[in-house]
Amino acid sequence: MIGAFRIVGYVIASADGRIADASGHPASLKLDADHRFFAAGLNHVDAVVHGRHSHEGEPDSVRRRRLILTRRVASLAPDPENSMARLWNPAGASFEEACAALGLSSGTVAILGGPLVYTLFLKRGYDNFHLSRAVNVRIPDGLPVFIREAYGGEPEAALAASGLTPGPTLWLDDEVSVTDWERAG
């Protein structure tokens, strides 16, 4: 928890731990079973957090409160393209201040990526992290889930090092598995 906020991560990674190809495109990771799991999970969150290149792409996305991480603002600013969103620079405003700008003082916040965003919240503390794997997809030279300079190795190693423990792996279909990592206590 960060203050009164429950922090939940969602990612689908390739079998080799990548979330997109070198150009930032995750097309090979757009799989129906994971999409349904992800969309169902987002129905239970109060806000989402992502970088400027990440987005959940759901029909109701514009109605969801969101923080978009960027260095283009000093602290917080309205998103000129979405009245439900705020641009947030963590160097200039705390997470609690950013959530307050969305009208939230508590609740569940979903972290949607990319690597800098996932790593920021790995340092701050996830309560739960849903790690989906596209077991038949490999993306050589792709983008990792977490910044490797800070948290080398596979996403599982980074999650374990941050104090999360894996639950059982659930198979969504023959292409996608998901493991829920949780903080004890």
Spell out what each predicted region is.
Residues 1-185:
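Enzymes that bind and transform nitrogen-containing heteroaromatic metabolites
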